[in-house]
């Protein structure tokens, strides 16, 4: 999974990225200190892996991973070349979802590019830049499709879609709110890889004082929550400065620090939950002495396709899957005991893999 972190200059975007990835990306109180995208990979915390590692006396534990891309700060007119221009747009097209850091804190020492704190205005600024960029992409496609449509029925059908989509974007609407039931049109939309079609998670960056109550008394946070609900986005509240402090601590110190702040989980854990929920992701597990590993798949994935995450041969030559749920295995204590109780199942090609399934795939190529 690849997430792009975006936001206006000086909203705490790079500070948050630093704390999430401990990559030490330069962060300073002036616009565009992140000129090239910084990339960091973080592991997804999953207590089940450690438990299985002990049970199987495993030599290696490999958690799922998320790749974060810190993309240079935006200003109005970025799609037309203002600020850093289109540099950020190419980088963001490759991500699975966008994490939009929104400033919901007051601090006279940190300037805001528009001179005041207004989360919804900031969201609109970035949305418009993404829309303008998508319109440019669409207009280039339309110019090609027009020529083809004169002698090609499918091209004519695609041109009709492109014109409807263009009108939709010109009303300052995001591509993800454009609805079509037609399978051809759905395939074309996916091919366009439009920025405004990507899922969005808002990171409401607050001061330490607003962290313990999850921003309930912060008007900016509440405004972002209402907006996100309307737009079918996820929101989590974070204090980037606190996250940066947390990133310097070991696990025991981190737990004590969070407890002192009245928090149950870190911002990273909130973000991972939000991204898994928004993208409809789950993890299945493989376990044995050589390695215990988590594999990330979409909800609804069938066994052969889940096997393909490990290797294409597993999917191509899939025979069956030997499955036991994590909870059943824990209740029984050992794989052998779970097998005795009939809790280890043999599943075929139509089996839909569940979160926490521990699977051994049988295949032949």
Name each region found by the language model.
Residues 1-111, 139-140:
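Conserved G1/Walker A P-loop phosphate-binding module
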Residues 2-6, 17, 144-352, 359, ...:
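C-terminal-of-GTPase-core extension/linker across diverse P-loop GTPases
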Residues 9, 131-134, 193:
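Flexible interhelical turns and helix-capping residues at alpha-helix boundaries
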Residues 12-17, 45-57, 85-109, 121-130, ...:
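Phosphate-binding glycine-rich loops and adjacent basic patches that engage nucleotide phosphates
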Residues 22, 54, 90, 128, ...:
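Short, intrinsically disordered, mixed-charge
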Residues 23-31, 38-40, 48-51, 80, ...:
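Glycine-rich, flexible loop/turn motifs
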Residues 32, 46-49, 62-68, 82-96, ...:
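Amphipathic alpha-helical transducer elements in NTP-driven molecular machines
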Residues 40-45, 72-82, 93-155, 168-182, ...:
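Conserved Switch II/interswitch segment of TRAFAC-class P-loop GTPases
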């Amino acid at each position: 999974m690849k997430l792009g972190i975006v936001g206006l200059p000086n909203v705490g975007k790079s500070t948050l990225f630093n704390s999430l990835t401990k990559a030490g990306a330069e962060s300073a109180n002036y616009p565009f200190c992140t000129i090239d995208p910084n990339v960091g990979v973080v592991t997804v915390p999953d207590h089940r892996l450690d438990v299985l590692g002990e049970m199987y006396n495993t030599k290696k534990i490999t958690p799922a991973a998320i790749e974060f891309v810190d993309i240079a700060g935006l200003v109005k007119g970025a799609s037309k070349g203002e600020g850093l221009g289109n540099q950020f747009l190419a980088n963001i097209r490759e991500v699975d979802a966008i994490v939009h850091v929104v400033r919901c804190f007051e601090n006279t020492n940190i300037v805001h590019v528009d001179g005041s704190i207004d989360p919804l205005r900031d969201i609109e600024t970035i949305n418009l830049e993404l829309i303008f960029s998508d319109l440019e992409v669409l207009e280039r496609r339309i110019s090609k499709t027009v020529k083809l449509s004169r002698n090609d029925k499918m091209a004519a059908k695609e041109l009709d879609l492109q014109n409807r989509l263009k009108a939709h974007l010109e009303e300052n609407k995001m591509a993800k709110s454009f609805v079509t039931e037609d399978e051809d049109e759905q395939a074309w939309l996916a091919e366009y890889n439009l920025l405004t079609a990507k899922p969005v998670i808002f990171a409401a960056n607050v001061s330490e004082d607003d962290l313990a109550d999850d921003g309930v008394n912060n008007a900016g946070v509440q405004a972002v929550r209402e907006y996100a609900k309307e737009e079918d986005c996820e929101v989590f509240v974070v204090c980037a400065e606190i996250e940066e402090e947390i990133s310097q601590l070991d696990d025991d110190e981190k737990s004590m620090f969070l407890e002192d702040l009245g928090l149950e989980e870190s911002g990273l854990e909130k973000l991972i939950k939000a991204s898994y929920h928004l993208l409809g992701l789950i993890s299945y597990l493989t376990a044995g002495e050589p390695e215990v590993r988590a594999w990330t798949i979409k909800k609804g994935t069938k066994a052969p396709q889940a096997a393909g995450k490990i290797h294409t041969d597993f999917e191509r030559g899939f025979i069956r899957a030997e499955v036991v749920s994590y909870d059943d295995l824990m209740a029984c204590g050992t794989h052998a005991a779970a097998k005795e109780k009939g809790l280890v199942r043999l599943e075929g090609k139509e089996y839909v893999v569940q979160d926490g399934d521990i699977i051994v795939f049988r295949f032949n190529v």
